[in-house]
Amino acid sequence: MSTNGDATKVVVIGGGVSGLATAYRVMKADPSIDVVVLEANDRPGGKVRSVQVGDLVLPSGADSFLARKPWAVQLCKELGIGDELVAPGATGAHLWTARGLVAMPKQAPFGIPGDIGQVFSWPGLSGAGRRRAALDLLKRKRKDDSDETLGSLLRRRLGDEATDRAVAPLLAGLYAGDIDRLSVRATFPDLQRWESWQGSLIRGAQAANRQSRKSDPGPMFVRPRGGVDRLTDALTAELGSSVRTHTVVYAIDATDGRQRVTLGDGTTIDADAVIVSVSAHEASLLMEDLAPAAAADLAGITYASTGVVLMVYAEGSQAGLPDGTGFVVPRGAAPMTAATWLSSKWPSDAFGTRAVARCYVGAVGEEDILDAADADLIAACAKHLAALVRLPDLPQHAAVVRWPKAMPQYELGHLDLVARIRRSLPEGIFVVGQAYDGVGIPDCVRAAGEAADAVVAYLQRDPAGISNDEETVR
């Protein structure tokens, strides 16, 4: 707590989902704390935002979030927008192959079939690839329980063909990453548990399906009606004047047992705690002088640059789309890494009979495409879609949104790296965000709650070792 009689102040640097949710949780835990959120851009929300494409407003960031991780859904309910949550109007996805799109197996968690019959009819694989994948049921499990790459686990269990053609396009796409560098423990720990407990990924998928049928989990993905922006807008409304936009932070220093945040205009804010919720490379620059060891480790978290190409087609074009919500692409096989049919996924939006597509471009090892001009990116994606499905050669309206250094890479050793960063931070400094504990919105919300709890506990400590409650009693 502040020792000079002023209100206890907490500064949150960064107004994305993580920063807003952490500030909200701190404010709710102790309304007496003066919380201020500093956001460099003209609006909070981070990568959760929409853009105008013709007469439509379309998501350039997340268009939904995982409902089976409950934290974002719970936050929506807490904010009074829980009754606005809607599920997609279509389900299922396709896999790109050289011969066209093929439907991905149903009831295949993480893209892995839970039935041997599905394995031997696995779309997109050769007979040899299917037979190799089926050996997962016979191969001995790994005895060493240390971390390994996602690619190492998948290739050992299912073989290269099933890994590269069928599973990696889905899993690696979520991180825009390289499966042979991503940590399985930091990205998809369930896969490691499946091998350990079931001795097989196929049996693990089968067990997951049985559990899912027992628990009736409901829709896998949801969003507030009107878009995910509703969540960040609701958080911003709750925080009110605590959120300051157009505010660049230059540095963080420690002085007299408190933290001092220096802004880009040279003014300073003294705080009892600072929560850093910007990218790891930005956090590294802020802490170069204050915590050089932490800064060096933060700089070691690499990022992939990505982008989206949003395309609105003419009236009547929706009929040319296949069933499902879109497709994923094996590494390097097409200009895009995946595509979503927004008009199929969210039919309640005002699309009419127009097909609306969102193509994802850029990933680790595939970032050069982002150097292309907007018109060339649009033309490349549109040409590829027209060859795959019954769409016109070009959309009526289109937009390109680039996200430079946007997706943190949870490479082998990521969990140890994050633990080391947090151990080396000075007292009163906390980090939270996509770079540390999960890239999806539910994981960011969960981590925000944990960070807020840690901040409040830190502020309520007594330097003499006596809790505030004990001091009050005395």
Q: In which residue ranges do the predicted regions lie?
A:
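N-terminal Rossmann-like FAD-binding beta1-loop-alpha1 element of flavoenzymes
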Residues: 8-37, 456
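Conserved Rossmann-like nucleotide-cofactor binding loop
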Residues: 18, 43, 281
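Glycine-rich FAD pyrophosphate-binding loop
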Residues: 27-54
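Short loop/edge segments at beta-strand edges and connector loops
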Residues: 87-89, 245-247, 253, 433
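Dinucleotide-binding Rossmann-like beta1-alpha1 core, especially the glycine-rich loop
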Residues: 54-141
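Active-site/ligand-binding neighborhood in enzyme catalytic cores
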Residues: 131-251, 259
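Conserved flavin/dinucleotide-binding core of flavoenzymes
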Residues: 3-4, 8, 50, 105-107, ...
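Mid-domain catalytic core of redox enzymes
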Residues: 247-357, 363-372, 387-388, 467-474
